[in-house]
């Protein structure tokens, strides 16, 4: 006999979703991708499955304000708030990109109360691979 899945929403408004069960995650990995235009924070478990994510754009910042340190701090706080409620205590931080939100996101992660095992910079650096695009003339 199959187990019934609880549904939320109604058929009339067309929004039917499956309710997620909150699992306990004691340890995870926090990925911070900081570009000049936006900052994306993704929290995964140790196996790499996404638990929570947030970006400066989803936090309500639009246009050039998405690249600011304050927007990165807000995005990191939003992504981590949900996993702290699920019981995450330890995490590893992987920071990628040259953006302004790198330090602000890391500061928000440290303030959240999660113990950090290590902070690693995983920005991809070419060993003189592809030719870069030509410089902009403004």
Swiss-Prot record:
Main location class: plastid
InterPro entries listed in its UniProt record: Ribosomal_uS11 (IPR001971), Ribosomal_uS11_bac-type (IPR019981), Ribosomal_uS11_CS (IPR018102), Ribosomal_uS11_sf (IPR036967)
Gene3D superfamilies: Ribosomal protein S11 (3.30.420.80)
Highest taxon, organism lineage: Eukaryota
Subcellular localization: Plastid, Chloroplast
Oligomer status and interactors: Part of the 30S ribosomal subunit.
HAMAP family with a match to the protein in the record: Ribosomal_uS11 (MF_01310)
Family the UniProt entry places it in: Belongs to the universal ribosomal protein uS11 family.
Protein name, as recorded: Small ribosomal subunit protein uS11c
Source organism: Acorus calamus (Sweet flag)
């Amino acid at each position: 006999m199959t187990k019934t899945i609880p549904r939320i929403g109604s058929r009339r408004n067309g929004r039917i979703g499956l309710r997620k069960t909150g699992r306990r995650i004691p340890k995870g990995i926090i990925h911070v991708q900081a570009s000049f235009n936006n900052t994306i924070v993704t929290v995964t478990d140790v196996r790499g499955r996404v638990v929570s994510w947030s970006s400066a754009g989803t936090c309500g910042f639009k246009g050039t304000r998405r690249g600011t340190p304050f927007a990165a701090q807000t995005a990191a706080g939003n992504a981590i708030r949900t996993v702290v409620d699920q019981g995450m205590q330890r995490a590893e931080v992987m920071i990628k990109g040259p953006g302004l939100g790198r330090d602000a996101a890391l500061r928000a992660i440290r303030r959240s109360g999660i113990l950090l095992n290590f902070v690693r910079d995983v920005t991809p650096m070419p060993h003189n691979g592809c030719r870069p695009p030509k410089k902009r003339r403004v």
